[in-house]
Amino acid sequence: MTDLKKAAQRAIELMDLTTLNDDDTDQKVIDLCHKAVTPAGNTAAICIYPRFIPIARKTLDELGAEDIQIATVTNFPHGNDDIAIAVLETRAAVAYGADEVDVVFPYRALMEGNESVGYELVKACKEACGDVLLKVIIESGVLADPALIRRASELSIDAGADFIKTSTGKVPVNATLEAAEIMLTVISEKNTKVGFKPAGGVRDAAQAAEFLGVAERILGADWVSPRTFRFGASSLLNSLLHTLELADAPKPTQGY
């Protein structure tokens, strides 16, 4: 297997296959669940709006794909600074049955010099999550300044984040290697049990390999696993299956 194919295979196993569109429907989420069961193995998770969690759970169970985690989003996409609303949304996501919650850090407040609201929001949402994994989206493409990307990462980890994530995918600049370098460095300094999720803008196996390479250089090859590294993506999967020459392959038979 070529290095590019190896990267494609790994990226599928590390993927949060995502649909977060205003026109999402039950059927689109059902289709996403089916796509997550690929000829190259299952993706790590799907990421959907909270209201679709029950239909996603039912579909994944029917597919015999209970190992695929269900992630959802809160305080999304604008990263408002109302802690009470973020906590209510997070509690609701957990009640719907989410395995993982991706919450947006109040990044605009940080840009205005307010560090405390971000820390307190993440801390409160982690308490609301309990054992549910909390990923914190810092919106690195809007923060832009390396010092702000670093500070948002530090505050999120200090407040209890299980993962730090680059982007919502709803702004012009999403995951970049420069942001990955900063965020992974903060993880190496603070807590190597915290995971990293580049989201948006990773289009093919070559780009996926670049992000994996940065993670391995900073934290070691053994660090990268679904517990510590995810790709947030919607269109990436098709490209990876083409790289693996599996785009038209039959799906594995699972479930009924």
Swiss-Prot record:
Swiss-Prot/TrEMBL GO biological process terms: 2-deoxyribose 1-phosphate catabolic process; carbohydrate catabolic process; deoxyribonucleotide catabolic process
Localisation: Cytoplasm
Pathway it works in: Carbohydrate degradation; 2-deoxy-D-ribose 1-phosphate degradation; D-glyceraldehyde 3-phosphate and acetaldehyde from 2-deoxy-alpha-D-ribose 1-phosphate: step 2/2
Coiled-coil blocks: none
Enzyme Commission code: 4.1.2.4
One Pfam entry name: DeoC
Protein task: Catalyzes a reversible aldol reaction between acetaldehyde and D-glyceraldehyde 3-phosphate to generate 2-deoxy-D-ribose 5-phosphate.
Family: Belongs to the DeoC/FbaB aldolase family. DeoC type 2 subfamily.
Protein name, entry field: Deoxyribose-phosphate aldolase
Organism classification: Bacteria, Pseudomonadati, Pseudomonadota, Gammaproteobacteria, Alteromonadales
Gene: deoC
